[in-house]
Amino acid sequence: MIVATDESQLEGLKKYQKQAEINGVDDLRMLSRDELAELEPAVVSFAGFMSPSTGIIDSHGLMLAYLGDAENNGASLVLNSPVTGGAVTADGIQLEVGGADPMSIVCKTVINSAGHGAPIVSRAITGVPAATIPANYYAIGHYYTLTGKTPFNHLVYPVARQDWLGVHVTIDLGGRCKFGPDFSWRDSLDYRFDQSREARFYEAIRRYYPGLKDGALQPGYTGMRPRITGQGQEAVDFVIQDHTVHGVHGMVNLYGIESPGLTSSLAIGRYVGELIANDRR
């Protein structure tokens, strides 16, 4: 559920509802304050809505399943093999691959889905127009875990701020509860946990869960968002480019695939497959 903690956030809820209708999500249900209190007694909110088709998954299990399907269809996972350079040629896209056994390979198809490194990979390949490659920025998100039994029955999201989703409640398949992520900029790919963020977490969470006790939060983990817009700029949607944008046949670049990239991964995969199929016609 998504909750507004005061009247000023009602416009945000209406915006979500309108976007859901545009995207074909037709099962959102607006909830009154009394209905919210019945569903989530620990949550204090002004209004909100329920998304009954939302669920949770084992993300690592999903990735292993993806890998198994890929390998069953002839793919290989090759780790520690960075793309160090390349060029667009008449025969295809030549990639210089580093690692323990450096090699040069010519590819008919390159799908650049390297997360934080996607703009870096594109810039390393001569022939990919620089004007089509976004800048890359680094933003870290911290997660804290809740000690003891979770008081929540659903995933709980506050109305988002301009550039991120806010500190929300996630419950995993084991019933464990975590809060996060927050949002702060970093100059490089730096996963260090900043314990000084703790006070801000308590403040943000208590806006909708005032029963949070001192000392109930424990440091969890961090994640880095592959941002393509910088500080002071409004967040943008995923950027997926094929030859109609950058002019390189056989290449699809995926930039800024942060949350909800995992949620969208199957749909993104189908879309990229369609782009490649259309390019080959």
Where in the sequence are the language-model features?
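Dinucleotide-binding Rossmann-like beta1-alpha1 core, especially the glycine-rich loop
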Residues: 1-39, 166
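C-terminal lid/capping helical subdomain adjacent to the catalytic/cofactor pocket in oxidative enzymes
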Residues: 30, 235-281
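Helix-loop-beta segment of a Rossmann-like dinucleotide-binding subdomain
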Residues: 1-2, 27-30, 35-73, 94, ...
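Helical element adjacent to the flavin cofactor pocket in flavoenzyme catalytic cores
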Residues: 49-109, 266, 275
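Active-site substrate-recognition segment that forms the wall
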Residues: 91, 103-109, 113-246
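A short, glycine/Asx- and small/polar-enriched loop/turn
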Residues: 8-11, 39-46, 87-94, 229-235, ...
